[in-house]
Design a protein with these regions (language model features):
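General beta-strand structural signal in soluble alpha/beta enzymes
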Residues: 7, 186-190, 216-219, 254
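Acidic, glycine-rich active-site loops and adjacent beta-strand->loop/helix elements
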Residues: 11, 39-40, 53, 192-194, ...
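Extreme N-terminal starter segment of soluble prokaryotic enzymes
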Residues: 1-5
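A glycine- and small-aliphatic-rich helix-loop capping segment at beta-alpha/alpha-beta transitions
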Residues: 23-28, 203-212, 232-240
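Short acidic, glycine/serine/threonine-rich loops at helix termini
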Residues: 18, 59-61, 74, 227-234
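Mobile "lid/hinge" segments at catalytic clefts and subdomain interfaces of large enzymes
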Residues: 212-285
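Conserved phosphate/anionic-ligand binding catalytic regions in large, soluble enzymes, centered on
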Residues: 7-22, 188-211
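Glycine-rich nucleotide/cofactor/substrate-binding loop typically near the N-terminus or early
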Residues: 24-174, 178, 238, 247-267, ...
Length: 285
């Protein structure tokens, strides 16, 4: 029997939600930390991996923290993306299910989204190892070729590099389509670039580590409303997510929830890794 990884995205999908789910499923944290530490990224950042209680369940929390006013803070800052209307989100259950001979369940995650401002009601443990980079910021932003070079220069396996490059390509093509430019001219700027690079690399490392045979996404659940970003006020789904869904045939279900549940990086992960949109009739869990 093959090992199929099933993502139940009842509360959407983002990069850090995906990494946390994969760690809870059994991806090796030591391998993830060591491999991320070899990425030649100039900007300082910290990786926080901790256990948190959500809906009375013990779950993994994965955060990329970037410096702000002398402190390392959650990267979801107002200067990147903010909701038009302030509200709290508790995203429950992006469950990653590995259907095969061996299986772990991952339930109820309440995670921040890549490059978006969400008010989270949870705290983070600081008693864990942090991965740092200690040089100056990369002010001009990075293009896809430069980011591919970062992956290539790391100790990521060939399989993980291939996954990361597929995710990056999907994201870059969507951004190029949104802005009416060539993929080679797309740049990911400032903090959002670091966050996206880490989330993409971490997802690829964990997926490769789990060694699954296929990935199932039946549907992505999305909210409604607007988000305020560097380009102004955008509708939900944001244009990059819409482009990814259209280009790759992703199925969406819209919920009566205000706010963004599917981020561009999350949609790119789904589009780049999906092998089926249908669950098998019977399976071992």
């Amino acid at each position: 029997m093959s090992r199929q990884l099933y993502f139940e995205c009842a509360s959407g999908i983002s990069g850090d939600m995906t990494v946390a789910a994969l760690l809870d499923l059994g991806a090796d944290e030591k391998t993830l930390r060591e491999t991320l530490g070899t990425l030649p990224i100039e900007e300082p950042y910290e990786i926080h991996i901790s256990r948190v209680k959500k809906s009375s369940l013990d779950v993994c929390d994965f955060l990329v923290k970037l410096p702000q006013d002398g402190e390392f803070l959650d990267h979801d800052m107002e200067y990147l993306h903010g909701h038009l209307h302030e509200h709290d989100h508790e995203h429950e259950s992006e469950a990653a299910h590995d259907h095969g001979h061996d299986h772990d369940h991952d339930h109820d995650h309440d995670h921040s989204h890549d490059r978006h401002d969400h008010d989270h009601g949870h705290t983070h443990s600081h008693g864990h190892e942090h991965d740092h980079s200690h040089t100056h910021a990369h002010a001009h932003g990075r293009g896809p070729d430069e980011i591919r070079g970062i992956f290539a220069a790391s100790s990521m396996t060939d399989g993980a590099k291939a996954i990361a490059n597929r995710i990056l390509q999907v994201l870059a093509e969507a951004e190029a389509a949104v802005h009416g430019t060539d993929v080679s001219l797309v740049h990911f700027h400032e903090a959002g670039a670091v966050d996206s690079i880490i989330d993409i690399a971490a997802t690829a490392i964990c997926l490769d580590n789990l060694a699954v045979d296929g990935v199932i996404f039946t549907e992505l659940c999305e909210g409604h409303g607007s988000v305020r970003c560097q380009h102004g006020l955008l509708p939900i789904p944001v244009p990059a997510v819409t482009k990814i869904a259209t280009a790759h045939g992703l199925k969406f279900r819209f919920l009566p929830v205000e706010g963004e549940l599917v981020t561009p990086t999350g949609a790119a992960i789904a589009a780049a890794t999906i092998t089926s949109d249908t669950l098998p009739a019977a399976m071992k869990i």
